[in-house]
């Protein structure tokens, strides 16, 4: 295995052995640099990952800016439940990959003042995009949050320009769920949601 520097249509720095090659290369055909490999003497060089100076990384032979992964973020947030005044659990975790946000919420109110307001979880980590690619969530756990007759009809919707999850009823999802709806149990019960959506400017 030996160290090589080459200059042909770009600058390449790499390690070469009898059957394998790894290299880092600036290229004249793109504004960035690639990390590549050759698996054997009988194979051709193949870029595995390209870092674009405009931002982001691409994979394989793809160097299109539109396809670059230009954002990755992990974090926590504090969701709130409308009409809740105190909490036992108030957990939120998210991962943002490119133009999608994936999240986990566990929330349980210990005190509340139910009203005719819609049942809404507020405080998502990013505002949703202003387009028709709507987001949503599914319930992976609910301890007596909804009655057995109402729970099957509940949808969790994230609309345009929103940082809220709204609970809706019915097969067409047009009716809002009020926090004092008698089909639902006290806000003191726990719910766990997972979901995803496109953020604004994502």
PLM segments and residue spans:
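Short, solvent-exposed secondary-structure boundary motifs
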Residues: 7-20, 36-44, 73-89, 137-151
């Amino acid at each position: 295995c030996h160290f090589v520097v080459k200059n042909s249509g770009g600058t390449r720095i790499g390690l070469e052995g009898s059957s394998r090659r790894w290299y880092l290369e600036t290229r004249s055909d793109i504004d960035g640099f690639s990390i590549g490999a050759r698996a054997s003497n009988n194979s051709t060089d193949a870029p595995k990952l390209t870092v674009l100076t405009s931002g982001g990384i691409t994979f394989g032979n793809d160097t299109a800016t539109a396809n670059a992964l230009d954002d990755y973020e992990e974090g926590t947030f504090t969701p709130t439940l409308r009409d809740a005044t105190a909490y036992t659990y108030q957990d939120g975790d998210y991962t943002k990959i490119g133009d999608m946000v994936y999240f986990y919420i566990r929330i349980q109110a210990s005190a509340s003042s139910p009203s005719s307001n819609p049942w809404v979880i507020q405080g998502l980590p990013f505002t949703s995009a202003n387009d028709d690619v709507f987001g949503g969530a599914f319930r992976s756990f609910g301890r007596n949050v909804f009655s057995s007759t109402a729970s099957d009809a509940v949808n969790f919707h994230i609309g345009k320009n929103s940082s809220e999850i709204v609970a809706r009823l019915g097969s067409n999802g047009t009716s809002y769920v009020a926090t004092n709806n008698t089909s639902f149990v006290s806000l003191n019960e726990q719910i766990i949601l997972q979901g995803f959506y496109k953020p604004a400017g994502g």
